């Protein structure tokens, strides 16, 4: 029944839709938020002021959805939580994030995208689960993905259970399957598997990016 209500809410006029989300589900939705024809199914939701979510996005089986102010999510994106054991299914987008169209995010673990970061182009995939051998058997386990502040991710990149430091750029088509520690310079990560291709001057890197 809950899923049916959420599905029907998608087509409601903007003021009624947001009122329904607040009153019925207790979600926190800021001022001047615009919600397009997108399906949102999450346990708790906190959307900051002036955020815009476009059309035909799907947020499914999320335990927690947190979106900072002035963030923009375009169209046809998929954010899928998981029922696997230990799944956090937590998606956190910082302030002024730009998330363009036709991307896929597996939110089995915790996926964080820092302030002023951009997921550009189309067809990028972000995966937050891995497979391990437990007592001789294969077992899926959730893992985290952390994208720092002011990161740019190019089209058709694949990010798997990794940390991307603040200020980094991920080249189009790259496959990032390991974490890269923060440095005093901006990193260009590219290739399959991704490696550090170039270091740029540290101008404008957020102070937090070099903290332990």
Indicate where each model-derived feature is located:
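Terminal amphipathic alpha-helical/low-complexity segments used for targeting or macromolecular assembly
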Residues: 1-32, 50, 116, 130, ...
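Residue-level detector of alpha-helix boundaries and kinks
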Residues: 5, 17-18, 36, 102, ...
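Flexible, glycine/small-residue-enriched loop-and-beta-strand segment within the central core
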Residues: 40-47, 52-164, 179-182, 192-193, ...
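A sequence-level detector of short, solvent-exposed, charge-rich linear segments
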Residues: 39-40, 86, 187, 208
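C-terminal/domain-terminus segments
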Residues: 169-187
